[in-house]
Amino acid sequence: MVDKRESYTKEDLLASSRGELFGKEGPQLPAPNMLMMDRVVKMTDDGGNYNKGFVEAELDIHPDMWFFGCHFIGDPVMPGCLGLDAMWQLVGFYLGWLGGKGKGRALGVGEVKFTGQILPSAKKVTYRIHFRRVINRKLVMGMADGEVLCDGTVIYTASDLKVGLFKDTAAF
């Protein structure tokens, strides 16, 4: 039985990365350094822009985060692909929250737009995922739109995020 709470702490997210939150057959979040959130502040199966589910999560920004030291030397900025990956992570996490089983894999995105950046001076990144559709049959797949906010301002948007859960990834 899935522990379906509305919010999750950093410790809960780390438990997910070890396969402990949604069970051995459920999807896992990545471990640090690739875990791109500190907490999930809201999860609902009937909210969001399409009334099909909503997730909101946050990442606290610190100037000593690993990516600022290498992207770019003398011009530190969080790579945009990490924000995109965070949105995929949250789509997969939501599928596990719904009781989906399998290994999560990003399947694509329709369009991504970057209109801002995350610098070491930022305080908080917020991710919002609005589900368009969830298929929960032999194929388990989530389709959603997402946005990334830096200190309250929308800086990335993504449409048609897709994540699937697979029992066997050998042929993937």
Swiss-Prot record:
Record-given protein name: 3-hydroxydecanoyl-[acyl-carrier-protein] dehydratase
GO MF, one annotated term: (3R)-hydroxyacyl-[acyl-carrier-protein] dehydratase activity
Protein localization: Cytoplasm
GO biological process: unsaturated fatty acid biosynthetic process
Protein keywords: Cytoplasm, Fatty acid biosynthesis, Fatty acid metabolism, Isomerase, Lipid biosynthesis, Lipid metabolism, Lyase
Any one Gene Ontology cellular component term annotated for this protein: cytoplasm
Organism: Sodalis glossinidius (strain morsitans)
Main location: cytoplasm
UniProt pathway annotation: Lipid metabolism; fatty acid biosynthesis
Subunit structure of this chain's protein: Homodimer.
Documented EC number(s): 4.2.1.59, 5.3.3.14
InterPro entries: FabA, FabA_FabZ, HotDog_dom_sf
Protein family: Belongs to the thioester dehydratase family. FabA subfamily.
Purpose: Necessary for the introduction of cis unsaturation into fatty acids. Catalyzes the dehydration of (3R)-3-hydroxydecanoyl-ACP to E-(2)-decenoyl-ACP and then its isomerization to Z-(3)-decenoyl-ACP. Can catalyze the dehydratase reaction for beta-hydroxyacyl-ACPs with saturated chain lengths up to 16:0, being most active on intermediate chain length.
Catalytic residues of the enzyme: H71
Catalytic activity entry: a (3R)-hydroxyacyl-[ACP] = a (2E)-enoyl-[ACP] + H2O; (3R)-hydroxydecanoyl-[ACP] = (2E)-decenoyl-[ACP] + H2O; (2E)-decenoyl-[ACP] = (3Z)-decenoyl-[ACP]
